[in-house]
Protein backbone atom coordinates (compact mmCIF):
# COMPACT_ATOMS: atom_id res chain seq x y z
CA UNK A 1 0.00 0.00 0.00
CA UNK A 2 2.81 2.36 0.95
CA UNK A 3 4.76 1.65 -2.25
CA UNK A 4 1.60 2.36 -4.25
CA UNK A 5 1.15 5.70 -2.50
CA UNK A 6 4.82 6.56 -3.10
CA UNK A 7 4.51 5.57 -6.76
CA UNK A 8 1.46 7.82 -7.22
CA UNK A 9 3.33 10.71 -5.61
CA UNK A 10 6.41 10.19 -7.78
CA UNK A 11 4.37 9.85 -10.97
CA UNK A 12 2.46 13.02 -10.15
CA UNK A 13 5.72 14.89 -9.48
CA UNK A 14 7.33 13.49 -12.62
CA UNK A 15 4.34 14.56 -14.73
CA UNK A 16 4.87 18.11 -13.47
CA UNK A 17 8.54 18.11 -14.51
CA UNK A 18 8.88 19.94 -17.81
CA UNK A 19 12.52 18.98 -18.19
CA UNK A 20 12.61 15.19 -17.90
CA UNK A 21 16.40 15.24 -18.25
CA UNK A 22 16.85 17.35 -15.14
CA UNK A 23 18.59 15.87 -12.10
CA UNK A 24 15.34 16.04 -10.11
CA UNK A 25 13.38 14.16 -12.79
CA UNK A 26 16.08 11.52 -13.16
CA UNK A 27 16.07 10.99 -9.40
CA UNK A 28 12.32 10.32 -9.54
CA UNK A 29 12.82 7.87 -12.40
CA UNK A 30 15.43 5.96 -10.39
CA UNK A 31 13.13 5.83 -7.38
CA UNK A 32 10.28 4.46 -9.51
CA UNK A 33 12.66 1.82 -10.89
CA UNK A 34 13.53 0.77 -7.35
CA UNK A 35 10.04 0.61 -5.83
CA UNK A 36 9.39 -2.91 -7.10
CA UNK A 37 7.13 -4.54 -9.69
CA UNK A 38 3.89 -3.57 -7.93
CA UNK A 39 4.28 -0.13 -9.52
CA UNK A 40 3.97 -1.59 -13.05
CA UNK A 41 0.16 -1.14 -13.31
CA UNK A 42 0.52 2.47 -12.15
CA UNK A 43 3.23 3.16 -14.74
CA UNK A 44 1.01 1.59 -17.43
CA UNK A 45 -1.85 3.85 -16.34
CA UNK A 46 0.47 6.87 -16.38
CA UNK A 47 1.29 6.28 -20.06
CA UNK A 48 -2.38 6.82 -20.94
CA UNK A 49 -2.21 10.42 -19.73
CA UNK A 50 1.38 11.34 -20.64
CA UNK A 51 2.87 13.35 -23.48
CA UNK A 52 5.54 11.96 -25.83
CA UNK A 53 8.51 12.93 -23.66
CA UNK A 54 7.05 11.41 -20.52
CA UNK A 55 5.93 8.31 -22.42
CA UNK A 56 9.56 7.60 -23.34
CA UNK A 57 10.50 7.81 -19.66
CA UNK A 58 7.65 5.55 -18.53
CA UNK A 59 8.46 2.98 -21.21
CA UNK A 60 12.07 2.96 -19.99
CA UNK A 61 10.85 2.34 -16.42
CA UNK A 62 8.54 -0.45 -17.62
CA UNK A 63 11.31 -2.10 -19.65
CA UNK A 64 13.51 -2.19 -16.54
CA UNK A 65 10.85 -4.29 -14.78
CA UNK A 66 10.32 -6.92 -17.50
CA UNK A 67 11.32 -10.42 -16.41
CA UNK A 68 9.71 -13.87 -16.24
CA UNK A 69 8.13 -13.16 -12.85
CA UNK A 70 6.57 -9.82 -13.83
CA UNK A 71 5.31 -10.76 -17.30
CA UNK A 72 1.67 -11.09 -16.24
CA UNK A 73 1.59 -7.42 -15.23
CA UNK A 74 2.21 -6.55 -18.88
CA UNK A 75 -0.80 -8.56 -20.01
CA UNK A 76 -2.91 -5.65 -18.71
CA UNK A 77 -1.03 -3.18 -20.88
CA UNK A 78 -1.61 -5.30 -23.97
CA UNK A 79 -5.31 -5.57 -23.06
CA UNK A 80 -5.86 -1.84 -22.58
CA UNK A 81 -8.37 -0.06 -24.79
CA UNK A 82 -6.03 2.89 -25.28
CA UNK A 83 -3.67 2.80 -28.25
CA UNK A 84 -1.00 4.80 -26.42
CA UNK A 85 -0.90 2.29 -23.54
CA UNK A 86 -0.77 -0.72 -25.86
CA UNK A 87 2.00 0.88 -27.94
CA UNK A 88 3.97 1.75 -24.79
CA UNK A 89 3.66 -1.80 -23.50
CA UNK A 90 4.78 -3.21 -26.88
CA UNK A 91 7.75 -0.83 -26.82
CA UNK A 92 8.75 -1.91 -23.30
CA UNK A 93 8.45 -5.65 -24.08
CA UNK A 94 10.32 -5.16 -27.36
CA UNK A 95 13.18 -3.27 -25.66
CA UNK A 96 13.59 -5.73 -22.79
CA UNK A 97 15.75 -8.83 -23.15
CA UNK A 98 15.65 -10.19 -19.61
CA UNK A 99 12.82 -12.72 -20.10
CA UNK A 100 11.77 -15.86 -21.94
CA UNK A 101 9.84 -14.55 -24.94
CA UNK A 102 8.18 -17.95 -25.44
CA UNK A 103 6.11 -17.20 -22.32
CA UNK A 104 4.32 -14.48 -24.30
CA UNK A 105 2.77 -17.17 -26.52
CA UNK A 106 0.45 -18.04 -23.62
CA UNK A 107 -1.07 -14.56 -24.01
CA UNK A 108 -2.84 -15.84 -27.15
CA UNK A 109 -5.21 -17.68 -24.77
CA UNK A 110 -6.40 -14.34 -23.38
CA UNK A 111 -9.24 -12.83 -25.46
CA UNK A 112 -8.56 -9.37 -24.05
CA UNK A 113 -4.95 -9.16 -25.27
CA UNK A 114 -4.40 -7.26 -28.53
CA UNK A 115 -3.11 -9.95 -30.90
CA UNK A 116 -1.59 -7.50 -33.44
CA UNK A 117 0.34 -5.89 -30.55
CA UNK A 118 1.50 -9.29 -29.31
CA UNK A 119 2.64 -10.24 -32.82
CA UNK A 120 4.75 -7.05 -32.99
CA UNK A 121 6.67 -8.05 -29.85
CA UNK A 122 7.14 -11.62 -31.10
CA UNK A 123 8.50 -10.35 -34.44
CA UNK A 124 11.11 -8.23 -32.65
CA UNK A 125 12.27 -11.22 -30.58
CA UNK A 126 11.68 -13.89 -33.24
CA UNK A 127 15.19 -15.33 -33.02
CA UNK A 128 14.60 -16.21 -29.37
CA UNK A 129 11.39 -18.13 -30.08
CA UNK A 130 11.15 -21.91 -30.09
CA UNK A 131 9.74 -23.45 -33.29
CA UNK A 132 8.26 -26.23 -31.15
CA UNK A 133 6.39 -23.66 -29.00
CA UNK A 134 5.25 -21.71 -32.06
CA UNK A 135 3.83 -24.91 -33.55
CA UNK A 136 2.10 -25.87 -30.33
CA UNK A 137 0.27 -22.55 -30.22
CA UNK A 138 -0.39 -22.40 -33.97
CA UNK A 139 -2.89 -25.24 -33.59
CA UNK A 140 -4.96 -23.21 -31.12
CA UNK A 141 -5.08 -19.66 -32.54
CA UNK A 142 -7.30 -17.94 -35.13
CA UNK A 143 -6.39 -17.87 -38.83
CA UNK A 144 -4.70 -14.45 -38.80
CA UNK A 145 -2.50 -15.26 -35.81
CA UNK A 146 -1.80 -18.72 -37.26
CA UNK A 147 -0.44 -17.09 -40.42
CA UNK A 148 1.66 -14.70 -38.32
CA UNK A 149 3.19 -17.52 -36.26
CA UNK A 150 4.04 -19.51 -39.37
CA UNK A 151 5.63 -16.42 -40.95
CA UNK A 152 7.92 -16.19 -37.94
CA UNK A 153 8.60 -19.92 -38.18
CA UNK A 154 9.59 -19.53 -41.81
CA UNK A 155 12.14 -16.89 -40.81
CA UNK A 156 13.77 -18.88 -38.00
CA UNK A 157 13.47 -22.54 -39.00
CA UNK A 158 16.68 -24.50 -39.53
CA UNK A 159 17.16 -27.66 -41.56
CA UNK A 160 17.52 -29.94 -38.53
CA UNK A 161 13.84 -29.22 -37.71
CA UNK A 162 12.60 -30.46 -41.11
CA UNK A 163 11.91 -34.12 -40.09
CA UNK A 164 9.58 -33.00 -37.28
CA UNK A 165 7.63 -30.76 -39.67
CA UNK A 166 7.38 -33.56 -42.23
CA UNK A 167 5.89 -35.81 -39.53
CA UNK A 168 3.26 -33.18 -38.80
CA UNK A 169 2.07 -33.22 -42.42
CA UNK A 170 -0.01 -36.27 -41.49
CA UNK A 171 -2.26 -34.18 -39.23
CA UNK A 172 -5.95 -33.51 -39.87
CA UNK A 173 -5.96 -29.69 -39.88
CA UNK A 174 -5.85 -28.58 -43.56
CA UNK A 175 -4.84 -24.99 -42.75
CA UNK A 176 -1.85 -26.24 -40.73
CA UNK A 177 -0.84 -28.43 -43.67
CA UNK A 178 -0.91 -25.48 -46.06
CA UNK A 179 1.29 -23.41 -43.73
CA UNK A 180 3.67 -26.34 -43.17
CA UNK A 181 4.03 -26.78 -46.93
CA UNK A 182 4.99 -23.11 -47.28
CA UNK A 183 7.60 -23.42 -44.52
CA UNK A 184 9.03 -26.67 -45.90
CA UNK A 185 9.22 -25.24 -49.43
CA UNK A 186 12.08 -23.08 -48.16
CA UNK A 187 14.36 -26.14 -48.26
CA UNK A 188 15.38 -28.00 -51.41
CA UNK A 189 15.40 -31.60 -50.22
CA UNK A 190 14.23 -34.82 -51.79
CA UNK A 191 12.19 -35.91 -48.74
CA UNK A 192 10.35 -32.56 -48.76
CA UNK A 193 9.77 -32.78 -52.51
CA UNK A 194 8.28 -36.23 -51.99
CA UNK A 195 5.96 -35.07 -49.20
CA UNK A 196 4.75 -32.08 -51.21
CA UNK A 197 4.12 -34.35 -54.22
CA UNK A 198 2.03 -36.68 -52.05
CA UNK A 199 -0.33 -33.94 -50.86
Please place each PLM-identified region on the residue numbering.
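HEAT/HEAT-like alpha-solenoid repeats
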Residues: 6, 111-114
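Structural detector for internal amphipathic alpha-helices that build alpha-solenoid repeat scaffolds
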Residues: 1-2, 12, 16, 22-35, ...
Amino acid sequence: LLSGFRADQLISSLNNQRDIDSAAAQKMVERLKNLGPKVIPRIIDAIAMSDKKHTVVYVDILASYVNDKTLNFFREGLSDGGERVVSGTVWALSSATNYNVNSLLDFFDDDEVSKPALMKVLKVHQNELSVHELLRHAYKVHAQEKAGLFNIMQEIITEDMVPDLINRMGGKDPSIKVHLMQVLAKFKRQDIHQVLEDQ
